[in-house]
């Protein structure tokens, strides 16, 4: 049999490629990487220094040639410079007996304002002199007779940051002066004496004389936009950075390895645990509590569009948020669609889902086979992630994007290590830099960048032998600096430096060694130290401690990848250290650890499994520590911020169900420790079983044997059930959950639709049955109750500084709780029953009698039984289901009662029943006592008041006005969406339809209303916004008088929801000033003057 010969083998000689030839093949990429990378970095670094177009604004007065007051509240409080010229003859309008009521020729603040002399400039008549007062300093004074004489020409005044000076031109100092015969002038220096400007006000009228001039240069250094040169440089810088990264990618491909898929296999599949996490996050998006700063951030975002830059609206004299404002700019764009809470927080929900996707698809598989295959690790990771995210990240603060940024930075570093390529390192630098500048707490992301140094050095060392160092480093340098372009796109280097120096000087600016304050707050029984927040942090610390201990003891956690797990641990430790350098110390900053908490939870779950920790004793001790963490966490309140707290069980007390939960958990801790001791002394085996369990039982046992997973999911269940129960128990009254669910149906105005406002309390007064209106209040019995039995000052008791709350304080360390108009006082004319007490809420003294039990000197027992007042019909009661009595004093609820009767019972002098009032408000100030009409039988036709004051302490007294049934309208109907409103920063998210007053070109819009949170919230946030901090309160208190309007929360009548104040200008006829605008080009180093610091 013939065989076929095999074909001869032909050896093919392939061309060899040397390192030098390979470098030549990538020469273009190398050149592009070097040139584009270096130029991109240079342009990014130069961006803050490049010129901008600044809009200038000049406030000139008189306007329209007349003596007419104008409003121009400067957001920076002071002008960069101020020049005033007043002809001497202009003072003639202040002279003579016919002008006794006219005292101010010109001022920068209304003379009626409480702090007018302390803060502003007033050119006024004092007795027979004309005095120029600047910030409580009489700068120059001249007799009015000399001012109106022939020698006096004009008064000039100039103000700059370093000095202020004034002179009466033509007048000289008198013979008794220090320098007789010298020009009559005054000067102050060594301090910033520039006066605060909220407008130009005068008591004079008519045409303005020639030569009268007021010219203030408004500080508009932040009202700027990029010049064409800067815009071109920024565009070119981004393009060159992109080109450098493309070149770096080409150099990366020189290793000959095929491209690895970017997304993990089956990344789109959803399992049972994924479904549970998604369901919890979505439900929490609707019913969950928000963070305290959501209103702060939302208002900044809403106002920024009209303002032209992202100013810190509530503090620091309107300086910009940059370099931390880019995330808020995205929220400002998002707010164009809707300002409803569920819409504004939609990006936060997307970040939460992305965080879990990254943890479950990227982090857990990279931590090693033991973590990847452990169900306990997955459940613990999910529980830890949710335990941190739910209480800390369900709002508009930047912590969610920082938590996500830290995870993405770590993933990019790990991809760089796995592929030995540099492009992921460059991407990590971009993500890390954006995370770093998302907010002050972005400093926690520095750990994710630091852990990239080691892998970067290794890869650079390997690649530099082929391509050199510069082609590899230049693109990374460009990537690390490109974030300067969006940060400084419309601002200058000098402006940002001055803004940050101002914030540090004004404060709060706590030092690194003040970090203990954050943990003090964590262990306070307040929303800052609530059960949920305390457990989140303690569980994170426990997971970190276990992971570190096992890594140190065994070199690595058995079954885990050493490099990635060490880097996760390192990032967390560095992040905790970096948090020490944040200028404020609040517990919501811990939200940046949400992603790391899930990752560490997975590591800790593996670290305490039987495979890694074989000792049953040690595993039991760990379980005892977890139970102790639960006990320590439940030694607090289940409290949340502001409206999120409505209806929440145990919101003001430690949880208790038949017995104290914290005590029960502590006892359980002792029992588990006794079990650990038994394992140590008696059953000291490792506890491993030889029988092979079923797959289901193995999974169940793995989860049950992970106490951290059980604890975290119990807390998650507790939080979700608490807030869901709050929504159910509050219904039909307002709650966060109800409001968010209704927003799906188009009802997006939040609390404004449920707050009922009583504009005219006089209209709802009940009519006396028999006695005259003036006498009815004391017609039954009046012993020691008199029309003037009320102290002149009934200001609410101040609240002392609470431990740990040292970030914001006023000058005396006290925060008073009185609402404007409720602090009492006296009137010149007596009221209907002879009382001179000043009444709150626009009550008319001519129609409202008042009786009180207080007297000067020794107190005596007092009793009051009013006459009968006619109740409305049952149909009318349904339309206004509340009875109100305005009262003042300090008394127990049982000491003031409401009695009802039928006509027959009243005629016989008997009552058919009685009830106590709900006392909502701050004692001893005026407040509205409430009683639901539903508690009064439908057969009752008359009511009367009964008060009994047997306490003889001087501070214990009662003052009452007649009962009334309020006629109310919703706050949305009263305030509307058009009026400018001063929204306190706690309420911004709850009132999304109200328009916050804006600012533009350095001048604030004048608000007509102010909405405050509940008393405790108002006391906490008002110091943030005051004059010392450069906030809007320092403007409104000079420009307007605030009056509290009576208001109630629908179907939740006894709730202190907050307050509505009407803001009335001291000069009602003053119009907004017209500014003279212009545009100039400024360099990045230009500064007009120092920023005002107080």
Swiss-Prot record:
Residues 817-831 have a biased composition (Low complexity). The chain crosses the membrane at residues 28-50, 232-251, 264-286, 341-360, 373-392, 431-453, 466-488, 530-552, 565-582, 586-608, 620-642, 657-679, 700-722. This is Probable arabinosyltransferase C. Belongs to the emb family. Gene3D superfamilies: 3.40.190.160, arabinofuranosyltransferase like domain (2.60.120.610), EmbC, C-terminal domain, subdomain 2 (2.60.120.940). Keywords: Cell membrane, Cell wall biogenesis/degradation, Glycosyltransferase, Membrane, Transferase, Transmembrane, Transmembrane helix. Its EC number is 2.4.2.-. InterPro entries: Arabino_trans_C, Arabino_trans_C_2, Arabino_trans_central, Arabino_trans_N, EmbABC_dom1. One of its GO terms (cellular component) is plasma membrane. Pfam families: Arabino_trans_C (PF14896), Arabino_trans_N (PF17689), Arabinose_trans (PF04602). GO terms for biological process: Actinobacterium-type cell wall biogenesis; cell wall organization. It is found in: Cell membrane. It comes from the Bacteria. It is a multi-pass membrane protein. Arabinosyl transferase responsible for the polymerization of arabinose into the arabinan of arabinogalactan. It is an enzyme of class 2 (transferase). One of its GO terms (molecular function) is arabinosyltransferase activity. Its main location: membrane. Residues 817-836 are annotated as: Disordered.
